Amino acid sequence: MNNWTRRGLISALPAAAATRLLSQTLPASRPKIKITDLKCAIIGKSPVIRIVTDQGISGFGQAESYKEYLKPMVMFYKKYLIGHDPTDVEHVMMQIRRMGAFKPWGAAVSAIEIALWDIAGKVAGQPVYKMLGGKIRDRVRVYNGGFRPPLKGQMPRDYAENVQQMKEAKEGYTLIKMAVGFHNGNMMKAIPDMWYDEPRGGTAHANKGVLTERGMNHILACTEAMKKVLGDQVGLALDCGPGFMIKDAITFARACEPMRLTWLEDLLTGDYTPYPNADLYRDLKQATSATIHTGEQIYNRQNFKDLIEKQAVDVLGPDPEDVGGIGEFKWIAEYADLHSIAVAPHGIFDGLIGLAAHVHLAAALPQNFIAFEYPYGQPEWWYDIIEGLPNPIVKKGFIDVWDAPGLGVNFRVNAAKARLSPEDSGFFD
């Protein structure tokens, strides 16, 4: 039996046949593609970025829909991008990654990274999930962290009614996340003396402290009312903080154990907390069988190292638009999987370009993936300026993965131009 090598096989063929074989197996060379410009426009309240190349291919990324103040920071990175090949995603990211930071300052770097993957996929004629190693699932589960009717009040019956309506939503969500405790300012003002400190204004999620017995009981009563409605048909996760003291966090988590909640999120740190506090989370996790979750505010893989290696939590929830992008998220998810830690990407405000990035990322994540937080277009007219999304987007709690090149979504340019401010009128030029 002959053991043919590829070189030996080709040498044994007639010249014409060998030429034909090579032309079929080796890609035609193309001119090196280069970044020529970086643009940023505020569409609605979302900073949307466009990376422009010398071959007429552009890539798009988006920061969260309330971060319009990030535009100058996005443009700060322009000088570090010009002239580089955008398909060498990691090489380009090495120029800028170290200049990001915890939420909200990682968003600019993350949006740029996502736009680079969009270009890489378009150049290759492949969906982004292929660039990330290929998909292991044809549909991806989402959870509802923000599509909810207005609460009529802050009593347990109001929360029960709210999740009943969410349970009946046409999207068929199999997992719902509700804000409680310090993550829910209205709940904490529902009755007097929920905790011992005074309410703080200013930046978001500024309150923390020691809960009163009344406060603890009210949060638990609202949680129990929601769980009674959802039963085991729809999972219930809670966005809790940041703000709990460790003793209150342990008390609350232990009280939740019989309810088998999907997770308790950000009890100790979270939104706008510029540190992970792995040791404290490890103490919490070891004190309860409830599922402990954190990670949305954390930037970069190095800042997840202690949480993962100390097995300080059960679930990590980085946001692709804050952590450094989808490639960065995938690295973290794979390392977490080695330590039996699940992932559930955060992303309620990531917008419709962000939604596309989530779908491609989730398709390629390892089997520790639970679900990602379903982003929505804000304002509603965003659905009129983007094409390429399935209709309906969510079916029975899942989104089907699409195969169009790049992120697979594009702007309806004329409709989008009508939403640009005069300052950003040249964004699509």
What are these regions (language model features)?
Residues 56, 112, 125, 176, ...:
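Conserved, mostly hydrophobic/aromatic
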Residues 139, 144-284:
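Metal-dependent enolase-superfamily TIM-barrel catalytic cores that perform enediolate-based chemistry
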Residues 123, 141-142, 343:
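Ligand-binding pocket scaffold of soluble enzyme catalytic domains
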Residues 71-72, 79, 84-87, 91, ...:
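Shared catalytic-loop signature of beta/alpha-barrel
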Residues 20-45, 49-51, 58:
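C-terminal segment of N-terminal export signals and the immediately downstream linker at the start
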Residues 1-24:
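N-terminal export signals
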Residues 406-429:
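Extended hydrophobic packing segments that form well-structured cores
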Residues 57-126:
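Metal- or metallocofactor-binding catalytic centers and their adjacent structured scaffolds
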